[in-house]
Every structure is written in C-alpha cells, then in structure tokens.
C-alpha cells in the first residue's frame, strides 16, 4: 500500500482549495503602498517561504486535539483538526480586514475532499467528497510586530480554528 493523502492532509488541502476558489470567484485584491491592487495568494505550509508574494493567507494543520467517541461501545469518533491560518498583508489594518473576510467565508464550514494522485497531471489530484467539516474559531488576533520585523511579519494576523469531522 502506498500512503498518499490521509485525513489530515485532505482537510488542509480542502481548506486551501476552498479559500483559493473564493479568492478567484470574488476577484479578491488588496492595495499596495502605491495604490496598485494585488491579488491575495493562498499558500500551504508551516514554514514561511521567501518566494511567496504578499498579501497572503498561509494555511497549515497544527494538531489533532480531540477524538471523542460518538457513543458508548462504538469505535466511531468525532475528531477535530486544529488548523492555523496566518494572514500577512502589505499595509497596517489590511490583515484585520482580510481575517474578517476569511472568518466570514469559512463560518458555515467547508466540504472535505478525499484527494488521490493523478499520474497524468500531478498538479491536479483527483478528488471526491469525503464529508463536511464544521468550523469552530479558537483564536482570532493580530500578531504583535517587533522593531526589526521583516515585510512578512509587519502586518500579520493569526486565526486558529478547529475543523470537526465524523470518522
């Protein structure tokens, strides 16, 4: 058996796909210091990549804090997956506005897909609906900036969410 995507990766990728689709659908942009509109980018990964372009939404799975049994004697569980969403923008105040937008978009939950490799096009894995993820907000707050912060850390906001799934 070749292990490809597990539930954790499916949840992370489903959230990323959802946000990317919403950005495209709404043609979401933010102004830079010169008043030029910049499209919001959505990236995956815990580590910051210097090749990424601001403004951005960074998404990664943090932990799996809950796995409660659904009923006595059952092996079915209600699992939660804690996800970090870091928002990094070009100008002060934009990070809060973009965080509000993200909260509004994911408030009703997201469809979770089961991804499988596509040998013909590795950049576009096949997907089928795995279930629905309920979203709970754990924290929503600006990340304090420090004096010599680089461009990626000056205007930053962090959302911590739990996505719940039966399984």
Predicted features, each with a name:
Residues 1-9, 48, 137-146, 167:
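Compositionally biased, intrinsically disordered low-complexity segments enriched in polar/Pro/Gly
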Residues 49, 75, 149-151:
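Generic marker of residues within folded, mature protein domains
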Residues 13-33, 96-104, 158-167:
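Short N-terminal helix-initiation segments at or just after the protein's N-terminus
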Residues 1-73, 116-127:
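Small/polar-rich, solvent-exposed N-terminal microdomains that initiate assembly or binding
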Residues 107-164:
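Acidic-leaning, charged glycine-interspersed low-complexity segments
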Residues 74-78, 88-121:
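Extracellular/virion structural assembly segments
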Residues 75-95, 153-165:
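Oligomerization/assembly interface segments of phage tail-like spikes and tubes
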Residues 15, 19, 42, 57-59, ...:
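Hydrophobic beta-strand residues in large extracellular and virion-surface proteins
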């Amino acid at each position: 058996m070749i292990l490809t995507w597990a539930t954790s990766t499916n949840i992370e990728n489903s959230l990323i796909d959802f946000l990317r689709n919403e950005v495209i659908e709404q043609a979401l942009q933010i102004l830079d210091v010169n008043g030029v509109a910049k499209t919001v980018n959505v990236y995956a990964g815990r580590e910051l990549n210097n090749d990424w372009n601001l403004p951005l939404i960074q998404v990664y799975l943090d932990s799996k804090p809950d796995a409660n049994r659904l009923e006595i004697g059952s092996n079915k569980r209600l699992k939660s997956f804690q996800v970090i969403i870091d928002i990094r923008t070009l100008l002060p105040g934009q990070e809060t506005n973009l965080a509000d937008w993200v909260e509004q978009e994911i408030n009703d939950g997201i469809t979770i897909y089961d991804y499988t490799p596509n040998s013909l096009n590795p950049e576009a894995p096949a997907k089928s609906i795995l279930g629905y993820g309920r979203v709970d907000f754990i924290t929503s707050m600006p990340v304090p900036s420090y004096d010599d912060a680089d461009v990626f850390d000056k205007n930053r906001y962090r959302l911590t969410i739990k996505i719940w799934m039966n399984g």
